Regions:
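Bacterial N-terminal signal peptides that target proteins for export
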Residues: 2-14
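Intrinsically disordered, low-complexity sequence elements enriched in Ser/Thr/Gly/Pro
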Residues: 6-9, 24, 222
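Hydrophobic h-region of N-terminal signal peptides that target proteins for export
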Residues: 17-26
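Conserved functional acidic sites
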Residues: 26-235
């Protein structure tokens, strides 16, 4: 009788554990739009090192889900995949996605994670990134830096309320990120230090609702740039 009770207890424990995993998976997936044919539009603001400002829009079309992946088409023709894994939600290019397959897309490290699990304050991970600052020498020599660096990401809030054009979005995840690198172009210039700060807000059933990024250097040849994008929310 005692052995029967032990078996029953173990089965209940396993069922509870499976229920927890499934519930968590559904909870985590809700931070990205999953409706077939869903289109999302962002207003984008950019300020370059010369303090010139520009505004434009980006649109993203969500295709039907493929097992644990969501294909997304950007208005410039770029196709990417948001992949839900045990360790978080990854963003992959079509080449990365096709080389690993639909159900076997987990990275060896967290280099592609947009959101890491568990979704709780203090969760931290590193991703690969590149600088987008430009170096300007004189009037006609402009160089893209494209310097690789490690970006440290941390969930700082999980129930943040933000306002987008008067509409309150509750229970947002706030992710704060920081990275730094340096570059030595050679004489007569000294070593140039670059810092990158970014903040992302994700909301249930919306996905990324707001994003801010600032790259700054300690050299006038690079200066700093500011990039922001905000989702247009109609519903």
């Amino acid at each position: 009788m005692k052995s029967f009770e032990k078996i029953k207890y173990k089965r209940l424990t396993i069922l509870y554990f499976l229920f927890f995993i499934i519930s968590s998976c559904k909870f985590n997936q809700s931070y990205f739009p999953h409706k077939e044919g869903k289109q999302i539009i962002y207003e984008v603001f950019f300020q370059d090192k010369e303090n010139k400002k520009s505004n434009f829009r980006q649109s993203f079309y969500f295709f039907p889900r493929m097992e644990n992946a969501i294909p997304v088409l950007k208005n410039d023709g770029e196709l990417t995949f948001y992949v839900v894994q045990k360790n978080g939600i990854e963003k992959k290019s079509i080449d990365e996605f096709m080389s690993t397959g639909i159900s076997n897309t987990k990275s060896e490290k967290n280099v592609d994670l947009l959101i890491a699990f568990p979704i709780s304050t203090g969760t931290e991970w590193e991703t690969n990134d590149k600088t987008t600052l430009q170096m300007k020498l004189g009037y006609d020599r402009i160089y893209n830096t494209n310097l690789p660096f490690k970006l440290t990401n941390k969930i700082t809030e999980v129930n943040k309320t933000i306002s987008i054009k008067g509409k309150k979005i509750k229970n947002c995840i706030k992710i704060s990120s920081y990275g730094k690198t340096s570059y030595n172009p050679g004489p007569p210039l000294d070593n140039i230090n670059i810092e990158v700060f970014s903040t992302s807000w994700f909301a249930k059933d919306y996905g990324l609702v707001k994003y801010k990024r600032e790259e700054k250097s300690d050299s006038e040849t690079m200066g700093k740039i500011i990039y922001e994008k905000t989702m247009l929310i109609s519903d």
